[in-house]
From Swiss-Prot:
Gene Ontology cellular component annotations, sorted alphabetically: cytosol; small ribosomal subunit
Function per UniProt: Located at the top of the head of the 30S subunit, it contacts several helices of the 16S rRNA. In the 70S ribosome it contacts the 23S rRNA (bridge B1a) and protein L5 of the 50S subunit (bridge B1b), connecting the 2 subunits; these bridges are implicated in subunit movement. Contacts the tRNAs in the A and P-sites.
Subunit details: Part of the 30S ribosomal subunit. Forms a loose heterodimer with protein S19. Forms two bridges to the 50S subunit in the 70S ribosome.
Pfam families named among the record's database cross-references: Ribosomal_S13
Name of the protein: Small ribosomal subunit protein uS13
Start and end residues of each stretch annotated as Disordered: 94-118
GO aspect biological process, one term: translation
Similarity annotation: Belongs to the universal ribosomal protein uS13 family.
Native source species: Aeromonas hydrophila subsp. hydrophila (strain ATCC 7966 / DSM 30187 / BCRC 13018 / CCUG 14551 / JCM 1027 / KCTC 2358 / NCIMB 9240 / NCTC 8049)
Keywords of the record: Ribonucleoprotein, Ribosomal protein, RNA-binding, rRNA-binding, tRNA-binding
Length: 118
């Protein structure tokens, strides 16, 4: 298995699909990475030589991925919460942030129902 950005990339998949195993790399970005590295999208990872894998590593290194991206997202949310803005308050209360209704629905964000005591 090839190791890129600290992730074991599956050998038996095509390069474009295999790169999506990295957090922060989707189909569009993986196509751009393959194009920049000069690798065909339909080539499987096991068929690449070490120089091509190294060029993939170099191209992936230009983007914020994996732990750095997770840390950046959590720091952005923490900053909103520290500012005390509306979005930060919604994050702090574990409610939907983007204007969705909460009278009904929103169960994923709110968690399981809490029993009402009479």
């Amino acid at each position: 298995m090839a190791r890129i950005a600290g992730i074991n990339i599956p050998d038996h998949k095509h390069a474009v699909i295999a790169l999506t195993a990295i957090y922060g790399v989707g189909r569009t970005r993986s196509k751009a990475i393959c194009a920049a590295a000069g690798i065909a999208e339909n080539v499987k990872i096991k068929d690449l030589d070490e120089a091509q894998i190294e060029s993939l590593r170099e191209q992936v290194g230009k983007f914020t991925v994996e732990g750095d991206l997770r840390r950046q997202i959590s720091m952005n949310i923490k900053r909103l919460m520290d500012l005390g803005c509306y979005r930060g308050l919604r994050h702090r209360r574990s409610l939907p942030v983007r204007g969705q209704r909460t009278k009904t629905n929103a169960r994923t964000r709110k968690g399981p129902r809490k029993a009402i005591k009479k």
